């Protein structure tokens, strides 16, 4: 007997029992970004490897350890996208979107990283990303944070997330800070683990993000990045904080927050929850004012964020916020000669006249008891029963599966009756 083929480790099926909650999250995301006037962009899931090496950074964990990279038949190195910002920037440059005007864009789809699978961290995962090009003030940074706060309220999780902010300054600001930080770390080299020692020479700011408790303990005495910020970076961050204060969004300044990708500058932020254990970040973003030019476009200010949909779904499950709209409202029960086609016609009539109604026809035969059992199983609230007599009389038996009442009504008035019950 042939061995069953399994899904790749860390890449999961989304089953019919799970997809309604996913659809709820995705619908909320689309509703919120549309309310702010942002436009959708769709990019390929495969890009040239060089795009991520240049954008994300050769020394980042994402590029050095986690990417799914392969050579195609022409010998070109290609990579399944590990994140969305680089591809979005590439698309904007290639299609001249940011030569003419500012752009406010969003996208949603699968990303891929070869990580150790665990709860909230998968090898195929889904992100929604929002990116703004051509605006440099703290006002648009604040709008993106306000947008995410609105989404949390829509999903009912706003009391279970907290916002952390930081400014990592400009590239120029970080040069002198990097020197001071490396000098400090060298004084405590015996405390650093191998990963921190590597980061100290490749990207010292990433040491601030370590999860090693021994290293965290010494970082309390490390130089503070805020003391090395230039006046422009300080004013930008102060402006952002002032705007958030004005709209009542609470936040905590976390001077160790640096994010894991090299393209960030000035504002960085994360929304964090305690509901998911170690995988507590549900959304993160910041400014990347140099990335467009770095990838061959003209110098363009930019800011954005990405959120992990798996983590949002997990969070809602953990908080038992799983109520979703039923997948079937009306179940067509039919038995007898000529009833099947009549049932299909009546179902289509309902779909045409009752907005948003979800009607399922019974197929495969079976007595009324079997069909009603199926109606209960799919969660229908109304059953419409057609027998030979009903077909002849142009009527239908309407049964309220919640209240238990039933009545015989004309097929011309059934739409009104159904609309009142669902």
From Swiss-Prot:
Cell compartments where the protein resides: Cytoplasm
Catalyzed reactions: tRNA(His) + L-histidine + ATP = L-histidyl-tRNA(His) + AMP + diphosphate + H(+)
A GO CC term assigned to this protein in UniProt: cytoplasm
Subunit structure of this chain's protein: Homodimer.
Main location: cytoplasm
Record keywords, A-Z: Aminoacyl-tRNA synthetase, ATP-binding, Cytoplasm, Ligase, Nucleotide-binding, Protein biosynthesis
A Pfam family this chain is assigned to: HGTP_anticodon
EC number(s) reported in the record: 6.1.1.21
Protein encoded by which gene: hisS
Protein name: Histidine--tRNA ligase
InterPro entries: aa-tRNA-synth_II, aa-tRNA-synth_II/BPL/LPL, Anticodon-bd, Anticodon-bd_dom_sf, His-tRNA-ligase, HisRS-like_core, HisRS/HisZ, HisRS_anticodon
HAMAP family hit by this protein: His_tRNA_synth
NCBIfam families for the chain: hisS
Any one biological process term the GO annotation gives: histidyl-tRNA aminoacylation
GO molecular function, one term: histidine-tRNA ligase activity
């Amino acid at each position: 007997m042939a061995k069953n083929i399994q899904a790749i480790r860390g890449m999961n099926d989304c089953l019919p029992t799970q997809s309604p909650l996913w659809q709820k999250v995705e619908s909320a995301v689309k509703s919120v970004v549309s309310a702010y006037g942002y436009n959708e962009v769709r990019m390929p899931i495969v890009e040239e490897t060089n795009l991520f090496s240049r954008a994300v950074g050769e020394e980042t964990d994402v590029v050095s350890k986690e990417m799914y990279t392969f050579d195609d038949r022409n010998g070109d190195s290609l990579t399944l996208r590990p994140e969305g910002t680089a591809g979005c920037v590439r698309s904007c440059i290639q299609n001249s979107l940011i030569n003419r005007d500012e752009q406010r864009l969003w996208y949603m789809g699968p990303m891929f990283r070869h990580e150790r699978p665990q709860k909230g961290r998968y090898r195929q995962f889904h992100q929604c990303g929002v990116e703004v090009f051509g605006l440099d003030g703290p006002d648009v940074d604040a709008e993106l944070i306000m947008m995410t706060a609105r989404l949390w309220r829509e999903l009912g999780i706003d009391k279970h997330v907290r916002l952390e902010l930081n400014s990592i300054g400009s590239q120029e600001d970080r040069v002198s800070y990097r020197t001071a930080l490396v000098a400090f770390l060298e004084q405590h080299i015996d405390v650093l683990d191998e990963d921190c020692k590597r980061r100290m020479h490749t990207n010292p700011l990433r040491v601030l993000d370590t999860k090693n408790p021994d290293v965290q303990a010494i970082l309390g005495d490390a130089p503070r990045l805020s003391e090395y910020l230039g006046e422009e970076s300080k004013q930008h961050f102060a402006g952002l904080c002032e705007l958030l204060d004005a709209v009542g969004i609470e936040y905590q300044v976390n001077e160790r927050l640096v994010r894991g990708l090299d393209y960030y500058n000035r504002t960085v932020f994360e929304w964090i929850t305690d509901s998911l254990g170690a995988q507590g970040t549900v959304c993160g973003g910041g400014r990347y004012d140099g990335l467009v030019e770095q990838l061959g476009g003209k110098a363009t200010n930019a800011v954005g964020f990405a959120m992990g949909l798996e983590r949002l779904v997990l969070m809602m499950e953990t908080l038992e916020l799983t109520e979703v709209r039923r997948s079937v409202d009306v179940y067509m029960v039919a038995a007898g000669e000529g009833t099947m086609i009549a049932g299909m016609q009546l179902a289509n009539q309902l779909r045409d006249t009752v907005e948003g109604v979800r009607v399922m026809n019974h197929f495969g035969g079976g007595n009324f008891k079997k069909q009603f059992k199926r109606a209960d199983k799919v969660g229908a609230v109304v059953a419409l029963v057609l027998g030979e007599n009903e077909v002849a009389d142009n009527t239908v038996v309407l049964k309220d599966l919640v209240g238990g009442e039933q009545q015989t009504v004309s097929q011309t008035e059934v739409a009104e009756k159904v609309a009142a019950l669902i």
